[in-house]
Amino acid sequence: MVELREATEAEYLDIIAMTNRAFREPAGQVDWKVETLIDGQRVDESLLRQDLAEPGARLLIWRDAAGAHTGHVRLDDDGDGAWYLAMLTVRPDRQDGGLGRTLLAAAEAFARARGGKRMRMTVVHQRRELIGWYERRGYTRTGETEPFPYGDDRFGRPTQAGLYFDVLEKAL
């Protein structure tokens, strides 16, 4: 059983570093696991703090039995039973062992235990394999899209034009 707990400010820099490694450093990883459509960082300290300042925002960390940081996820309680999932991250050297599925299930259970009725997220539309991974876990595309934040390098630098996000949702 995965025990998620609220991250402390002292853990933010480690969380940022792991997120950027997992999302943006393709060395030794298969393409679907990294955002090769976007260069640069995935998150920085100012963006993380801005996100966590939003009402209902939580940054949850998962440490293994030895205390090693294994993964983390950001969840936002958007009210009325809706939760938003972002930055689901498993330490790159621990991927391919089902830990992503385990962390996702723990995040869903966390939201459900707090009245969550549905989980939403956004995924870059062009990342078909990642969308498929979430669809195999019960998420569906809602038909809604959101624009990619071109020009805001806090999210990274797109390597091509035309990126946007699909909104995915799952009943909890």
Model-identified regions with their sequence ranges:
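A short beta-loop-alpha structural element at the N-terminal edge
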Residues: 3-17, 24
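Conserved GNAT-fold acetyl-CoA-binding loop/helix
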Residues: 20-49
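A short helix-loop-beta-strand connector motif used in the catalytic cores of GNAT acetyltransferases and
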Residues: 44-61, 161-164
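Conserved beta-strand in the GNAT
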Residues: 61, 68-76, 84-89
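A short, internal acetyl-CoA/4′-phosphopantetheine-binding micro-motif in the GNAT/acyltransferase core
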Residues: 63, 88-95, 123-125
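Conserved acetyl-CoA-binding loop-helix of GNAT-fold acetyltransferases
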Residues: 90, 96-109, 136
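C-terminal "cap" of GNAT-fold acetyltransferases
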Residues: 117, 124-131, 137, 144-172
